[in-house]
Design a protein with these regions (language model features):
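Solvent-exposed loop/turn segments at secondary-structure junctions
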Residues: 110-113, 130-133, 148, 162-172, ...
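A local structural motif
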Residues: 96-98, 135-142, 213, 267-277
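Short helix-initiation/N-cap motifs at beta->coil->alpha
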Residues: 90-92, 141-153, 276-285
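Bacterial Sec-exported substrate-binding components of ABC uptake systems
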Residues: 2-112, 211-244, 364-393
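Short helices/loops that flank or line small-molecule/ion binding pockets
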Residues: 150-160, 181-182, 283-292
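His/Asp/Glu-enriched short active-site or ligand-binding loop at hydrolase and phosphoryl-transfer sites
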Residues: 128, 257-280, 300, 332-336
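A short, structured surface patch at a secondary-structure boundary
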Residues: 102-158, 162-170, 272
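Extracytoplasmic substrate-binding proteins
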Residues: 83-84, 94-96, 103, 173-252, ...
Length: 393
């Protein structure tokens, strides 16, 4: 073998070893335990992470075009020191979490998805009935129907290091106090765009998954900024008037201070309920007809999830309302029914993209929200997206 051939062989061997090492590093993850003692408060930053367009430590300026830059997920290799971490949850409570956290009960589906997306599903020892994704969590014991109605006895008996729930738990003071009196660390959060990024950030610290949390936050921030950058500068006279309705009650809408209102405004729409005094006002049919919305958004009722028939029947009921028959939204067919999961938790940017494309289709011709949804599910859960989430598609 001559020197030139030998040199080429050595180079090929070096490249093979380098590739193998990189793949091993990608696949090898540390134990899901907590990071060293530190104090972290959601009030420590000057801007609320839910303030769309604000820069966070994990946020990057969009690259040219629409290609989102991805990066490998690498975790800390240094063993953490198990002490404690203090966070401020959505109720304003200072919550001290003893570290390491080795067992969690989650009573909210969005928070369960965050924990699993961070690669810590093995820490879940219980869930509420609504926590049904990823499919593998269905093997976890059910410890209540919701955050409002947990099985206190079962949870206390299981002795979790941490319990996460949505604000419905704080409304049930008796149950909330029983759990805390039993010595269980309870974090109450809001599962929407106003708080989800904070939850991801501090759960990344608690679970020693800061790098994975950064990748997840980068995904959310990328698409959030994409929408913000494309709709900024649109004058109000070119923005569609939007009527958005809750699933629970006809004519109940979203006013200032609600996540639904924030979604509409961020996506480049004008909320017809923006001048109401309540966050969740009930509007009169006459008021909606007078505002003559260009787009109507209807949340799919929970009991109708899982089939196209539920979407179709919900839309048909809205189209048949006498007060709406003469509105531009009905006349142009811009009445959309959506599963609320698309704007909750880590799926929030998916809902934002759907809203933006419905409001300004000409600005988002190159964006397929369904494809983004599929990418998110594949990248962070390793499964394929199934089901129906919007109608018409």
């Amino acid at each position: 073998m001559d020197k030139r051939t030998l040199a080429i062989a050595i180079l090929i061997l070096a490249l093979a070893l380098s590739t193998t090492y990189a793949l091993l590093n990608w696949r090898t993850e540390p134990e899901c335990i907590s990071s060293p003692d530190q104090s972290w408060s959601s009030e420590s930053e000057s801007q609320n992470p839910g303030d769309l367009g604000s820069q966070t430590p994990n946020q990057e300026i969009l690259p040219e075009g629409n290609q989102r830059q991805t990066q490998p997920i690498e975790e800390q290799s240094k063993p953490p020191t198990p002490k404690n971490l203090t966070v401020v949850d959505s109720t304003g409570e200072n919550i001290t979490v003893n570290l390491p956290v080795r067992s969690i009960v989650s009573l909210n589906h969005g928070m369960t998805e965050v924990i699993c997306a961070l690669g810590c599903e093995q820490l879940l020892i219980g869930r509420s009935a609504s926590c049904n994704f990823p499919p593998s969590v269905l093997d976890k014991p059910v410890m209540g129907s919701s955050s409002y109605s947990p099985n206190v006895e079962l949870i206390v008996e299981s002795k979790p290091d941490l319990l996460v729930a949505d604000t419905m738990l704080s409304y049930n003071k008796e149950v909330y106090n029983k759990l805390r009196d039993a010595g269980i660390t309870v974090i109450v959060e809001i599962n929407n765009s106003t708080r989800i990024k904070k939850f991801i950030e501090y759960m990344g610290i608690i679970l020693n998954r800061t790098e994975r949390a950064k990748v997840l936050l980068d995904f959310i921030n990328y698409y959030e900024l994409l929408v913000v950058n494309r709709v900024k500068g649109i004058p109000d006279e070119l923005k569609p008037r939007v009527y958005s309705e809750w699933a629970a009650t006809a004519w109940r809408s979203y006013g200032p201070g609600s996540a639904g209102h924030l979604m509409i405004v961020t996506a480049g729409g004008l909320n017809i309920a923006s001048e109401t005094e309540k966050a969740y006002p009930t509007l009169s049919p006459e008021f909606v007809a007078e505002k003559n919305p260009d787009v109507i958004l209807i949340m799919l009722p929970g009991e109708l999830k899982g089939s196209i028939e539920g979407f179709v029947s919900t839309r048909d009921e809205v189209l048949a309302r006498p007060a709406l028959t003469g509105t531009r939204a009905v006349e142009t067919g811009k009445v959309y029914v959506y599963d609320p999961i698309i704007y909750q938790g880590i799926r929030y940017p998916v809902g934002l993209l759907y809203f933006a494309k419905w409001f300004h289709p000409e600005l988002f011709k190159d964006i397929d929200p369904g494809q983004v949804h599929s990418e998110l599910i594949r990248q962070f859960f390793g499964v394929s997206l199934e089901g129906i989430y919007v109608y018409p598609p």
